[in-house]
Amino acid sequence: MALAVPQTAVPRLPRGVRLRRDEARGGWVLLAPERILQPDPVAVEILTRVDGRASLAEIVDSLVAAFSAERARIDADVRSFLDNLAEKGFVEFDR
């Protein structure tokens, strides 16, 4: 179920959730109480921009500039990814 998140919403990692580099696992991990995810490189590009200050629109714009990709496509992918993480409690939105 997709969330109706406005472009001005600011995604953030909730208390107790953090993204960190894990050399033992050979990549990045998203840690939460009693849960762990190993994000792929595309997910890491998104998650490193989720800093609790940048809006959804700013994150999308940053990715468009970094990858010279179509904004509509990146917007849809970022929304889908963050909606999925929000449903699982790994991301929250300040509106």
Label every model-predicted segment:
Residues 35-95:
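Long, charge-rich, low-complexity alpha-helical segments
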Residues 1-44, 48, 94-95:
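Acidic, low-complexity/disordered tracts enriched in E/D and polar residues
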